[in-house]
Amino acid sequence: MKYPNLLERFLTYVKVNTRSDETSTTTPSTQSQMDFANNILIPEMKRVGLENVYYLPNGFAIGTLPANDPSFTLKIGFISHMDTADFNAENVQPQVIENYDGGVIPLGQSGFNLDPADFASLHKYKGQTLITTDGTTLLGADDKSGIAEIMTAIEYLSAHPEIKHGEIRVGFGPDEEIGIGADKFDAENFDVDFAYTVDGGPLGELQYETFSAAGAELTFQGRNVHPGTAKDQMINALQLAIDFHNQLPEADRPEKTEGYQGFYHLMNLTGTVEEAQASYIIRDFETDAFENRKAAMQAIADKMNQELGRERVILTLKDQYYNMKQVIEKDMTPIHIAKAVMESLDIQPIIEPIRGGTDGSKISFMGIPTPNLFAGGENMHGRFEYVSLETMERAVDTIIGIVSYQEK
């Protein structure tokens, strides 16, 4: 095995519960992420050869591998996140399936199975080593595979000084899954020309386009009277919420869109006749389309208020992150390098938009162009999550190839 510590490192990481908490007011949102960084990652970062290793109050563990050849002038960063998604992460018991035979994989004693009939991606991995869940938790390959791959690449480079490279910065951060991890990223002191998040999915993913994203919070104010005498008096706040929703295009919902299509997504609807609340997320790739979606919601609210004779529909819009393509397309060097390295490794680059966001979305707008590399995970965020060890090894190869790349 080229990277003998990769599997054990990954298994150690995923057994630690680092689930983030969107209701928390602290950064990191959970103490477990802080403990994971200080008790496991920081000591290991030092062991694998990183220097100037420290932990910031913003939740990031940072380290540097100095250049070993002055002809490599580019300084490159690699970033992954510690937290896992909103699914049970307590007592993760990963299964290691060696030489996968292409059949159904029972997930422990849970009664759940990984079945190629349900998950066609499994067909790609026959003969490989797969790491799965036991059916009671997620796995945490998103994004502990990325952390393990970066750590393993640094370990390998430290042990092989004949591989020449420039300065490398590493950052492991919190709370990506709840969308706030990069808000306090110290870009000024993460001194690199560009970086990569190692937070993608299957082999070959190379992404530099994300959604632009906003959140919409709506309050609907009704007027409650006895339903027996309600004619021309009652204003049902729940009905206002329904009326608002029905004025949004039915085709512009997540379950009906793909590729570069944007959407409105109703996340939550609660209330009574007197008052109701609705939460939406708004997503699109193009700036004009993104702005038009927000304007359309405001126009619906304004129209309803005009018809109601007073402000009963209160809309608050808040931008969350923007399509990092706006930054990265100004200098495609990180994409050209990653693509060239993958091709040299016989990896077919898969350059597609991310129908979501990464920490790189925000970090790019802080002045560090940060596209996304594959980390290997499949079926992320749930009990059917799995990852191929061979794909993780290829991610390590890619990281090493990027830092040692020079134009011929």
Curated annotation (Swiss-Prot):
Subcellular location: Cytoplasm
GO biological process: one example: proteolysis
PROSITE patterns, A to Z: ARGE_DAPE_CPG2_1, ARGE_DAPE_CPG2_2
CDD domains: M20_peptT (cd03892)
Cofactor: record remark: Binds 2 Zn(2+) ions per subunit.
Residues annotated as catalytic: 83, 176
Residues that hold Zn(2+) 2 according to the record: 142, 177, 381
Entry keyword Transferase: no
Family: Belongs to the peptidase M20B family.
Function: Cleaves the N-terminal amino acid of tripeptides.
Protein name from the UniProt record: Peptidase T
Annotated organism of origin: Streptococcus gordonii (strain Challis / ATCC 35105 / BCRC 15272 / CH1 / DL1 / V288)
